[in-house]
Regions:
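Ankyrin repeat structural motif
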Residues: 35-47, 76-85, 107, 113-115, ...
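Classical Sec-dependent N-terminal signal peptides that target proteins to the secretory pathway
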Residues: 1-18
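N-terminal export/targeting and maturation segments
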Residues: 16-44, 149, 181
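Ankyrin-repeat C-terminal turn/loop position
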Residues: 50-51, 88-89, 112, 151, ...
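Ankyrin-repeat boundary/"N-cap" motif
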Residues: 19-32, 54-71, 92-129, 155-164
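Extended alpha-helical scaffolding segments
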Residues: 129, 133, 143-156
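Terminal, low-structured helical/coil segments at or just beyond the last alpha-helical repeat
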Residues: 158-186
C-alpha cells in the first residue's frame, strides 16, 4: 500500500510539473519507508525533479534552518545520509552540535548522564564497556566522513566539552587535527 501511495504521489508531481521539494523532509522522517527506499526517492527528487540538495526548512521559533543531512542523521537513515553527501549537501555546524549532543543523550539513555558538568563514577565506569566503545567508534567514523566532506573541525565545540568531562577529548582532538591536515593538503 505504501508503494502505491508513493507512486501515485510521484506521478501526480510529474503530471503537474511541480514538485514540492520540501516533501523530501517528510520522506526522510517517514517510518513506513526503509532507508534504502528513502535514499532512492531523495535521489529521484534531486536528480530528476531538480530539487536542491542544500535546501533548508524554516521552523518558527528556531534560529537555525536544518538541512536534509541533519534530518537524515536524526532519523538514523545512513544510506540516505550518504546519498545526500554524494549529492553535495553541505555539512554544517548544527549537525556537529547534534553529534555532540548524541553523546549526552546516549549517556542519559544508559542511566549515566552528566550532572553539573561532572562525570559520575558510574559514567567513568560505563565508558569502559563495549557498548560505549562501539557507539564512539561509529560516531568518530561519521565525523571523519564529515571532515572529508568539508566539515569545519571548529564545529565540534559541544562534543569537545562533553568528551573533556569524561577525559576523552584527546581522541577527538587527534581526529580533528588529522581532518584539518587533509583539508590543508587539498
Amino acid at each position: 500500500m505504501k508503494h502505491l501511495a508513493m507512486i501515485l504521489f510521484l506521478i501526480t508531481s510529474l503530471y503537474s510539473h511541480e514538485a514540492n521539494c520540501t516533501d523530501m523532509f517528510g520522506l526522510i522522517y517517514n517510518k513506513n519507508l526503509s532507508d534504502v527506499e528513502t535514499a532512492k526517492y531523495i535521489k529521484y527528487y534531486i536528480d530528476d525533479l531538480g530539487c536542491d540538495a542544500n535546501m533548508t526548512i524554516e521552523i518558527p521559533d528556531l534560529s537555525i534552518r536544518p538541512n536534509l543531512l541533519e534530518y537524515a542523521y536524526d532519523a538514523n537513515k545512513t544510506k540516505t545520509f550518504d546519498t545526500l553527501l554524494a549529492k553535495g549537501t553541505a555539512v554544517n555546524a548544527s549537525l556537529a552540535t547534534s553529534i555532540g549532543m548524541s553523546f549526552a543523550f546516549f549517556f542519559r539513555e544508559n542511566g549515566v548522564g552528566i550532572d553539573n558538568k561532572k562525570a559520575s563514577p558510574e559514567l567513568l565506569e560505563f565508558i569502559k564497556n563495549q557498548k560505549y566503545k562501539e557507539f564512539k567508534e561509529e560516531k568518530f567514523k561519521l565525523i571523519k566522513k564529515l571532515l572529508e566532506h568539508g566539515q569545519d573541525p571548529k564545529d565540534y565545540k559541544v562534543l569537545k566539552i562533553i568528551l573533556k568531562i569524561i577525559n576523552e577529548e584527546k581522541d577527538l582532538e587527534n581526529l580533528l587535527k588529522d581532518g584539518a591536515k587533509k583539508e590543508l593538503a587539498q
